[in-house]
């Protein structure tokens, strides 16, 4: 009987303690729920975003004693709006970044073009002067006939070879710096690129009217820019 009495008293005490604990939790939860409604969940302070740890502390403090796996509605609404704001800012930054890249690329291309233009302008006059020398070398080489070389002796042959080599080296130097010959024979006449020095009646020409039948003096272009027009004979009606 004594044991049963002790057991009964122990159960009664445990039940009383459990009831008191539940009452304390209910009172604390009600207080926390009420306080969470009054908490300011704004994630910005003085125009600056709070750190994650600081905002977490605010939220956890407001739900002390409650289920910490649930976010208060006020905090959820703030975080949802903050997400939308961050997404909009991200898109804005991305757009500005892409525009900045495009502008940087345009500046780089303009810089390269301006540098190339400056280089071409710097050597253009010098190239024009050298073209006259090249023309003279061409005339000198073409004026010597094979039979003249046979009868002219060793001195003439050596001179001819020296002039030919000079002409070849000059042509390679021209090509190295982007200066190339332009022979528009058989092409359509373009007054912007060619200089018509005479006309050929279509009855005596192989090319159609308006085309170049013969080139009497080759032209030159520097970096794809004409610096001397080719002198040509154009087919006319």
UniProtKB/Swiss-Prot annotation:
Short name of any one Pfam family annotated for the protein: GrpE
Keyword list, A-Z: Chaperone, Mitochondrion, Transit peptide
Any Gene Ontology biological process: protein folding
Entry-linked SUPFAM superfamilies: Coiled-coil domain of nucleotide exchange factor GrpE (SSF58014), Head domain of nucleotide exchange factor GrpE (SSF51064)
GO-annotated cellular components: mitochondrion; PAM complex, Tim23 associated import motor
Recorded GO MF terms: adenyl-nucleotide exchange factor activity; protein homodimerization activity; protein-folding chaperone binding; unfolded protein binding
Locations listed in the record: Mitochondrion matrix
Keyword Cytoplasm part of the UniProt annotation: no
InterPro entries, per the entry: GrpE, GrpE_coiled_coil, GrpE_head
Complex and partners: Probable component of the PAM complex at least composed of a mitochondrial HSP70 protein, GrpE, tim-44, tim-16 and tim-14/dnj-21.
Function noted in UniProt: Essential component of the PAM complex, a complex required for the translocation of transit peptide-containing proteins from the inner membrane into the mitochondrial matrix in an ATP-dependent manner. Seems to control the nucleotide-dependent binding of mitochondrial HSP70 to substrate proteins.
Protein name, entry field: GrpE protein homolog, mitochondrial
Organism of this sequence: Caenorhabditis elegans
């Amino acid at each position: 009987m004594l044991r049963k009495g002790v057991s009964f008293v122990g159960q009664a005490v445990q039940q009383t303690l459990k009831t008191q604990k539940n009452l304390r939790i209910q009172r604390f939860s009600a207080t926390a729920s009420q306080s969470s409604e009054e908490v300011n969940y704004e994630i910005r302070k003085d125009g600056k975003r709070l750190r994650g740890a600081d905002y977490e502390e605010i939220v956890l403090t407001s739900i002390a004693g409650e289920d910490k796996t649930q976010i208060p509605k006020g905090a959820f609404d703030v975080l949802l709006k903050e997400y939308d704001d961050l997404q909009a800012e991200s898109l804005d930054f991305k757009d500005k970044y892409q525009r900045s890249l495009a502008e940087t690329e345009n500046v780089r291309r303009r810089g390269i073009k301006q540098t190339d233009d400056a280089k071409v302008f710097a050597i253009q006059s010098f190239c024009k002067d050298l073209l006259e020398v090249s023309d003279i070398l061409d005339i000198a080489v073409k004026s010597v006939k094979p039979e003249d070389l046979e009868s002219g002796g060793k001195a003439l042959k050596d001179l001819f070879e020296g002039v030919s080599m000079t002409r070849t080296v000059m042509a390679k130097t021209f090509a190295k710096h982007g200066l190339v010959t332009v022979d528009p024979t058989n092409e359509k006449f373009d007054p912007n690129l060619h200089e018509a020095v005479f006309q050929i009646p279509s009855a005596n020409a192989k090319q159609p009217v308006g085309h170049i039948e013969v080139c009497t003096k080759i032209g030159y272009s520097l970096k794809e820019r004409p610096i001397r027009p080719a002198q040509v004979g154009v087919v006319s009606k």
